[in-house]
Amino acid sequence: MSQINQAQYLQQLGHNAKQASYALANLTASQKADLLDAIADALTENTLAILAANAKDVAAAKAEGLNDAMIDRLLLNESRLAGIIGDISDVVRLADPVGEEFGSRVLDNGLRLTRRRVPLGVIGVIYEARPNVTVDIAVLALKTGNAVILRGGKETLESNKLISEVIRGAIASQGLPVDAVQLIDSSDRALVTGLLKLDQYVDMIVPRGGQALQRLCAEQATIPVILGGIGICHLYVDKAANLERALEVIANAKVQRPTVCNALDTLLVDKTIAANFVPQIVEYLHCLGVRFSVCEQSHALLDGLGFDIELATEQSFATEWLSLTLGIKVVSDIDAAIAHIRRHSSGHSEAILTDDIHAATHFMNEVNSAAVYVNASTRFTDGGQFGLGAEVAVSTQKLHARGPMGLEALTTYKWLAWGDYTSRA
C-alpha cells in the first residue's frame, strides 16, 4: 500500500469511526446490553471457525520459531474462548457509567450546573499477540458508547480478522453501524504511525505492549496516549513482617502468572531479617522453578547453597522479567526500600509486608505508584479483581486514568447549564 493509499485508508477508517460514534453515544443501557448479548451469541455460534483461524496463527507462529510463552499468549482453545465469551456477560451486568450526572449545583445567578458522563468518542487500541483483547476492547468500548479502531499484532491476524467480522455482524444485526468496530488488517507498521496522528477523528490511543511500542506512541502520537502495562513491581519485606505468612504471598506474586505485568520483579528485604529470610525465601521459590538475580549481600548469604543465582547489576533491578526470574536486594531500612522503588519502579504496583501499622502507613504515603498494597500480592492489580470488569489496560500515568482502566476510564464529562434566559452580569 502506497503512502497516499495508506493515508486515504486511515482517513476513511477515522471518518467511519467518528460517524459510528455519534450513533453509539445515545444508546440506552438496555440497547447496549442487547448489543453485547448479540456479540456473545455470535461468537459462540462461530466458535469452530474462530478456532480454525487461530490454528492458522499458531501454525505460522511455530513455523517462525516463536517461543512457547508467545505461542501460549496467542493460543485459543474451546475453553479459553468460552471464558472470553463468558466475560461479556460480566460486562453486561456492570453499571453503565454513561449518562450519570454528578457535581450538580445552582449558582447565585440561578444557573443550574451539572456534569454528565459521556463517551470519549473514538478509541484507537494497538496491541500484540492476544486475540482476547480484540473481544475485550470491543465490548468495553461499545458498553461505553465508543467506536474503536483496533490494530492487533501480526501473530494473531487471522484470529483478529475473523473475530472482528463476527462482532461487526452482531452490530449490524442490532441496526447499528458496523464501523463502530474496525480492524486494521495489515501488519504494515507505517499504519501504526499513521493511526497515532489521526487526531481529527481519534480521541485516545491505548497501546498494550512492550516498552518499544509504548515509546513509539509517546513520541509519535498527536493524540492523547494512555501509557502503561509495563510493570517493574516491587515487594518489600519489612523487619516487622510475619515471615511464615510472607512466603505464600511472595510466591503468589511471582509464580502464579510470571509473564504478566503485575507479577513481582524485585523482592526487597530488610537487612534486620535478611540472614534468615533470604535463604528461606530462595529455597521456597527455588522449588517452584524460580531463578534469582541478587545483590552482593544476598549472594554472600546464598553462596554455596546450590541455588540458581546470578549477581545482579543495576540494570537487573530496572528489568521487567516477565519470567520466573526474580531480583532480590537487601536494603538497610524502609526508607532505603522506598528510595529503590522510586529509582526503578515503572509506577505499576508495589507492596509491603509488615505487621507494623506505622511502617505500612509510611510506605503507602511515600510510594506513588498506581497501586500500593499492604500485606497483599501485587497480582491484584487487575480490572476484574478490582471489580471493574474486564480492563482496557493498566495505566501507569497520572492524567485521565490510573491503574486498571474499566468502563469509567473510557468516558469523560461535559458541563450542562440550565438558565432562564440568563445573561452574565
UniProtKB/Swiss-Prot annotation:
EC number(s) of the enzyme?
A: 1.2.1.41
**GO molecular function terms here?**
glutamate-5-semialdehyde dehydrogenase activity; NADP binding
Keyword Metal-binding on entry = no
A single GO cellular-component term on record: cytoplasm
What InterPro entries does the database record attribute to this sequence?
Answer: Ald_DH/histidinol_DH, Ald_DH_C, Ald_DH_N, Aldehyde_DH_dom, G-glutamylP_reductase_CS, Glu-5-SA_DH, GPR_dom
Q: Which reaction does it catalyse?
A: L-glutamate 5-semialdehyde + phosphate + NADP(+) = L-glutamyl 5-phosphate + NADPH + H(+)
Has UniProt tagged this entry with the keyword NADP?
A: yes
Q: Which UniProt keywords apply?
A: Amino-acid biosynthesis, Cytoplasm, NADP, Oxidoreductase, Proline biosynthesis
Give the main location.
cytoplasm
Q: Name its cellular compartments.
A: Cytoplasm
Q: In which pathway does it act?
A: Amino-acid biosynthesis; L-proline biosynthesis; L-glutamate 5-semialdehyde from L-glutamate: step 2/2
Q: Under which main EC class is this enzyme filed?
A: oxidoreductase
Q: Name one GO biological process term.
A: L-proline biosynthetic process
Q: What does this protein do?
A: Catalyzes the NADPH-dependent reduction of L-glutamate 5-phosphate into L-glutamate 5-semialdehyde and phosphate. The product spontaneously undergoes cyclization to form 1-pyrroline-5-carboxylate.
Name the family the entry cites.
Belongs to the gamma-glutamyl phosphate reductase family.
Name by which UniProt lists this protein: Gamma-glutamyl phosphate reductase
- Gene that this polypeptide is encoded by: proA
